Amino acid sequence: MLKIRPDRNIGSNIQKARYGKGLTQDETIAKLQLMGIEISRSTYAKIETNRINIRVSELIALSKIFDVDFNYFFEDLTL
């Protein structure tokens, strides 16, 4: 049976999308909060560095903020 590796690339893909929009973490968090997603700076930083998992609702909001397809965050994931 294959072991599933942590979703290491999701955080990296989030960071790439944020850079692509020219946003800082603080600006991204402010936009998330305007959409009703309560998240702290430390939590967001942990998501981008793959130390904690992200909620689906947060991914959906980020896809709208960064104007990317939801599937973008799952590119280059490996088992």
What are these regions (language model features)?
Residues 17, 31, 47, 76:
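Residues in the recognition helix of alpha-helical DNA-binding motifs
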Residues 72-79:
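Short amphipathic recognition helices of helix-turn-helix/homeodomain-type DNA-binding modules
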Residues 51, 55-72:
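DNA major-groove recognition helix of helix-turn-helix/homeodomain DNA-binding modules
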Residues 1-21:
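A short, Lys/Arg-rich alpha-helix, primarily the initiator
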Residues 23-46:
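Short alpha-helical DNA-recognition segment
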